[in-house]
Amino acid sequence: MAHNNIEYAETIALKAVKFILTDDETQKSFITTTGILPADLEIMVKDLNFLGGVLDFLLANEDKLLEFCTNYDINPEEPAKIRRLFPGASYD
């Protein structure tokens, strides 16, 4: 079920942050890729640019994306659909 509101999109992105932080391998990859440390996340999670970047991180790794979607019972197409609601989305 696709949703086109930012509140829903933020909820999914925050679940993605939780998923990233609870898996050591994914967390290390996220830190290496972004340079953002877990201690900085309390402030960062309020930034829509950051939340869009979190979705980009998962969208770039299909295995992790599918694991996230399975864990949270989310349609695997949903993160890509809601990504466009955040700043910096690519429309190609």
Task: Show which residues each predicted segment covers.
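Metal- and O2-centered redox machinery and metal/ROS homeostasis
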Residues: 1-92
